[in-house]
Amino acid sequence: EQPGEIAIMIRYQDKASVFRGVIPLGVPVEGTPAESNFIDKFIFAKLKKVGMPPSEVSDDSTFLRRVTLDIVGRLPTVREAELFLKNNSTNKRAALVDRLISTEEYAEFFANKWSSLLRNKRSNGAQLRTTMAFYDWIKESFYKNKPYDKFVREILAASGDMKQSPPTAWFKQVNTQQAQMEDASQLFLGTRLQCAQCHHHPYEKWSQSDYYRFMAFFSRVGKANAGRPGEDMVFHRAGIAQVTNKKTNKPVKPAGLGSKELVISAVDDPRHLLVDWMKTDENRLFSKTLVNRYWKHFFGRGLVDPEDDFRSTNPATHPKLLNALADYFE
């Protein structure tokens, strides 16, 4: 027997159930550090359960290096190290974090990460203006601490040209209804719907109906030439939002995953209703996916791993902690 923890799936015909099996290391866990926040409470409880003593509290030099790398993507300067190591304040570590996340370097570092997630790239010289405008918008969003739901809404429901709305660049790279639906679901809800296009997975909950109804949120996106090479105007085309379910060959209207079809007027942009649903859905995938993505950034592995693959057969290692993080974020 090897100590550790693993998720085990049991299946019978078209039914499946998952539980996490644990073989404790068996070492007594005593004298854990003082809890700094609710996260420590969950982690220390898990360490005691599996019999794994916590690591020693890092020294100041190690803490400074790790935090600076994780928040602004570089090593601390000599001057920063001198000031931090000389500081005898009891809250200097929290103050360091607060200082770093208020810098332009922080905004630049995470703008690079989100540019990659949002496929913000240029395939030719004509797209340079668009690419840079979208990057600058992402950076400014982080620098001004824009609310996350507003950040997502301004991307998914972007309208206008590059000057009016830089996130319209997303529709340049993700340029089909299918790609927009699949990217939005995987990036913002941690849910991979690609397989549901062709069949209902025997062990997962999303069906072809879910796939096409979710796609219908993007069915009224229109694009036109903005007058410059490589730039488009994105707009809402008035009309009934619907797509054809290729399995039934019948039209379906927009619906959140596992939800009923929505009644949307011809003049309303369904993309706004998509973000409204994301924020309020009882599954809370919108919040859980983001906090899990940041957990992976800071700790190397998500509570759900891969970080964009939330499903019943891929459970979180710490489900209560994931819920608590989502609570705190909301």
Predicted features along the sequence, with ranges:
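Short, structured secondary-structure elements
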Residues: 2-12, 16-260, 267-275, 280-330
